[in-house]
Amino acid sequence: MGGLNQGGSEVLLMRQGTIQRATIGGYFQLRLSSPYSVPLFNPRDYLTKPHEYNQYIQDNIDLLCGDAMLELQSNAISTLANNQIPGTNTWVAIINWLNDFIQPIEKDYDMVFLDANPSFSMYTQIAIATSTKMVLPVMADDSSRRAIQNAFSLVYGLKLPSEIYSKYAFAEKLKEVDMPLPKVYMILKNRLTQYMGAASAYATVLQEIDKDVLSLLKTYTDMFAFKTLDMGIID
C-alpha cells in the first residue's frame, strides 16, 4: 500500500472511509448485525487492489485491509459466539465468518493468505479456522519458544493444564462439527538471526525450538504438513 514512507497510512484511512469501510473491520461490522446467517453482500466491495497505490505490487493481488477496529469489535464477537440459542451453534456460525466471505469468490484465487494477530482472540480463531495451513514465525528468544508451545496448546489442545479445559478447547469445538484443523506448514526463523554467531545464546534458543518441534513431529505427525525438520523449518 506504500508503507510508512510512501503514504500507506493515508491510503488505509481512505479505504476505511469508504461507504462500505473496505477493511476486515468493515466486513465484521456488517456481520455484527447478522451474526448467525449470511447477509446479502458483495465481498469485492471490501477488497482493495494494492497495485493501484503501489506499482511494485503485482496486479493479480487483492487485499482485505486490516483494521484497528477489530479490537473494539472483539468483545462483541466473543459474546455473540457464546450466546445460547436453541437450534443454532452460535460459535460455529461466528467462526465461519471468513469462510462466508471467501466462498462467493474462491474460484477467482489460487491462494489466500491470512495474517493473524499472535493473540488467541476470537478474530484470530476465525482466521485459523478458515486456514488449511499455518506458518509460524519465531524470533531467537524464549518468548518465541513459549509462543510455539502455546500455539500447539491453543490450536491443537496439546498439554492443557487440566482436562477441564479440553471440553472448551478450540480443537475440540472444531472436531465436534467435523471442521479440520490447519496443519503446520512451515516454521520461519526471523532473518535477524543471520548476524548472530552459531555459538551465541540465541542459537541455543533456536536449537531448543527445533527440539520442541521435533518431539511434537514424532508424536503428532498428522498435525504437520512436513515429515522432517529440514522440510519445515526455514532459517
Predicted regions, residues:
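P-loop NTP-binding core
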Residues: 1-235
